[in-house]
């Protein structure tokens, strides 16, 4: 992320009669990466200031590779900006292509949102893999347990045993 910031910094200066450039970080990062680390790299390598000379935003990727029931267009897009003007520019960009854009108050909130989504998934996959081991020793079919638990219309989300987290 930071090396990319170094590489794109020289291109941030707006041309005459054009709007400020927009940089949107999409990678999974820890809270503070956009408004501290990336901003520092972009500013120090361009001589420009985020929010004043260029827009800076964060919007986490939310895809589930291999699933065909959700498209990039239909998955709500969490967006944030370094300043309110940066947020507006990010909302304008994604609203042109995404059905639902969900603005949050800061880049840190958006970064923490992505981490929370990933942690939720990781914890539940780890849990169901452990349950599979325990239930097998007890002679219980974990797949049947998950299907039965899935009949509860609230408070349960099925996760299935597998080789790990996957991703890309």
Predicted regions and their residues:
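Structural/interface elements that position substrates and couple domains in central-metabolism enzymes
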Residues: 1-168
